[in-house]
UniProtKB/Swiss-Prot annotation:
Name of the featured protein: BURP domain-containing protein BNM2A
Domain notes: The BURP domain located at the C-terminus has not been identified in non-plant proteins.
Origin species: Brassica napus
InterPro entries, per database record: BURP, BURP_dom
Keywords: Signal, Vacuole
UniProt note on tissues of expression: Expressed in the radicle and cotyledon of germinating seeds 2 days post-imbibition (DPI), in stems and roots of 30-DPI young plants and in floral buds, but not in fully open flowers or leaves. Expressed in the embryo and seed coat tissues of developing seeds. The protein accumulates only in seeds and only long after transcript accumulation becomes evident.
Chain segments annotated as transmembrane: none
One Pfam family linked to the record: BURP
Gene Ontology CC terms: protein storage vacuole
């Protein structure tokens, strides 16, 4: 199994994350492909095309899926490099206020209309970053790589080594990467990382790169997974996280709808897009 873990040095971290920002962005999408492909599978939580407009809604799966041989349809959407926002240094980011209370100033600063899609996305990002953590959760928003690294260390690492995991698509020839819908099968038994503290960091819509990072103080399982496409060309190697206790989650959380489970009643698992970052520490 290809290892996803390594000790972080700041120059190496910068190189890794800068690269990740300029590659593809993955969305895991649950769709019905064909009756033949579904034969013998439990597809009760898979959705037909068009049930949700946003493909990022289909990143979730059940913990019972997490085993050798399970087949899941996954859709990888190529990121438009022209739309990747700039990456600021800590010095640059610290000069710009980052709070919903400063929204009017920020919209004017970036010349963005309040009612535009970009303006609404900015508001939602700031609101999410301003929200207080729920009981048993830790969260923060990193507005630069330096601040994200420092906050990750402070939150989960203390004196322990901080490591990073990302999702990667491996192919014999880069020209053979396909972003169409494929069936992927767990090619190896998922490897659970015991005794791990974890922070998942998701890139948010904003005029510059912002990561929303969150994790739970207990009740989270972390796995390394290997997924092979049906054509045997693409190997997806990356982290998967299962939240074992969802009793404190919002009852309207989209994961419950996607998986068709009673709210707060069962574990919820998910993969990570390629531009997400997962911090782990013993």
């Amino acid at each position: 199994m290809a290892s996803l873990r390594f000790s972080v040095t700041f120059p190496a971290l910068l190189s890794l994350l800068l690269l990740s920002l300029w590659v593809v962005e993955a969305y895991t999408s649950r769709k019905l492909i064909s009756n033949n492909e579904q034969e013998g599978q439990n597809i009760s939580h898979l959705f037909k095309d068009g049930e949700f407009e946003d493909p990022t809604m289909y990143m979730f799966f059940k913990i019972s899926d997490l085993k050798l041989g399970t087949k899941l349809p996954i859709y990888f959407n190529k990121n438009d490099l022209r739309k990747v926002p700039p990456l600021l240094t800590r010095q640059e980011a610290d000069l710009i206020p980052f709070s919903e209370s400063n929204l009017d100033f920020l919209l004017n600063h970036f010349s963005i209309s309040k009612d535009s899609p970009q303006g609404k996305a900015m508001k939602e990002t700031l609101k999410r970053c301003d929200f207080k953590a729920i009981e048993g959760e830790y969260k923060f928003c990193g507005t630069s790589l330096e601040s994200m690294l420092d906050l990750a260390k402070k939150t989960i690492a203390s004196n322990a080594d901080l490591k990073v995991m990302t999702t990667k698509v491996m192919v014999p020839d880069q020209n053979r990467i396909s972003y169409a819908l494929h069936n992927y099968t767990f090619a190896e038994v998922p490897k659970e990382l015991d005794g791990i503290k974890v922070l998942g960091c998701h890139r948010m819509p904003y005029p510059y790169v912002v990561y929303y990072c969150h994790g739970h103080k207990s009740g989270t399982k972390v796995f390394e997974v290997n997924l092979m496409s049906d054509d045997g060309i693409q190997l997806v190697v990356g982290p998967a996280v299962c939240h074992m206790d969802t009793s404190m989650w919002n009852a309207d959380h989209v994961a419950f709808k996607v998986l068709k489970i009673e709210p707060r009643s069962a574990p919820v698992c998910h993969f990570f897009p390629l531009d997400n970052i997962v911090w782990v520490s013993k």
